[in-house]
A protein has these predicted regions:
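N-terminal alpha/beta PP-like core and its mobile active-site loop of ThDP/TPP-dependent enzymes
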Residues: 1-176
Length: 176
């Protein structure tokens, strides 16, 4: 509640900088009626707005399933990052008639054969090709293919902070 949520600013910033999906669900004092006035109430939604892809207070119990699902979707989609959902005590206690939303399949855009062939043609025609390896390269299927690509082509490469370790940095092709 309130002040305790401030301890999550560092993980939220880290998720934003590192493109890591993170869903933060914080509590809050009741918003409809409160006997404690504003004691220990911090505007968590505003605090997290610059750090998160979305920062929302849930104000209706029927919206909990859809907002949680949307929070997870938004946190994972390109570019991943943090999403904050603030759930006040009185809203959390509301009865809801909304059904639980089943998980959905995640689909990534994949370039067609013609686009891949054209990209390969341009890369192979380059006079001094250089690879920049970033965060997207650390996906399971991409990293293995990228290591093979570097090995097969002999192209020099460097990486961003989030691309480190995808291809062996001890390689003579690594530029730092």
């Amino acid at each position: 509640l309130g002040p305790g949520a401030t301890n999550l600013t560092t993980p939220a910033a880290y998720a934003a900088l590192g493109a890591f999906p993170l869903v933060i669900i914080t509590g809050q004092k009741p918003i409809k009626t409160s006997k404690q006035a504003q004691f220990q109430i911090v505007d968590v939604v505003s605090l997290f707005t610059p750090l998160c892809k979305a920062s929302t207070q849930i104000v209706n119990g029927n919206r909990i399933p859809s907002l949680v699902r949307e929070g997870f979707r938004l946190a994972q989609e390109e570019r991943p990052g943090a999403v904050l959902l603030e759930l006040p005590e009185d809203i959390a206690e509301e009865q809801t008639v909304e059904p639980v939303i089943p998980p959905h399949d995640r689909r990534y855009a994949v370039a067609g054969d013609a686009a891949l062939d054209e990209a390969a043609r341009r890369i192979l025609a380059a006079q001094r090709p250089l690879l920049l390896i970033g965060a997207g390269a650390n996906r399971r299927r991409a990293s293995k293919a990228l290591r093979k690509f570097v090995s097969d082509t002999g192209f020099p490469f460097f990486d961003t902070q989030m691309g480190k370790g995808v291809v062996d940095e001890d390689s003579e092709l690594y530029l730092g």
